[in-house]
Amino acid sequence: MDKIILNGGIVMANIYTSAEQLVGKTPLLELTHIEKALNLEAKIFAKLEYYNPAGSVKDRVAKAMIESAEKSGQLKEGSVIIEPTSGNTGIGLASVATAKGYKIIIVMPETMSVERRKLIKAYGAELVLSDGTKGMKGAIAKAEELAKEIPNSFIAGQFVNPENPKAHFETTGPEIFED
């Protein structure tokens, strides 16, 4: 995050230089209409994760998996990120990976919506479609095949990566208590 001083000495604070800097710190909204409608004494809150840059809670997971891989040395300059997905994690990974300068290949079943495909491509990812009749198992197999063929590649592994749930333990949960 930078501060910019404009002509006349006006200071613009909170200027971000990359989309991944905007992940997290999403607002909480009290759902008063539901509380009233159900005559509840308890309070109900919603964490508005659509405020994340790529529009979902999966942005947190994407950022955590990429940053953990960078710290461990699995991911470095010139690496290619590969991920099998059916949607939001792939969108989040495409957003964060592109912002950090990585090439990313998203593998998804051909049965996924055209809108998801367009969004993934709009974030700068290469999209590889797998056989829709094989579901996510087919997408995982295709991603593993690509990883064997592409040097310096890294599968983020949302389904098995402990950074996925850890992201919420370290960010989402504490944010709820801080708000």
Q: Which positions does each model-derived feature cover?
A:
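PLP-dependent amino-acid enzyme catalytic core
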Residues: 4-179
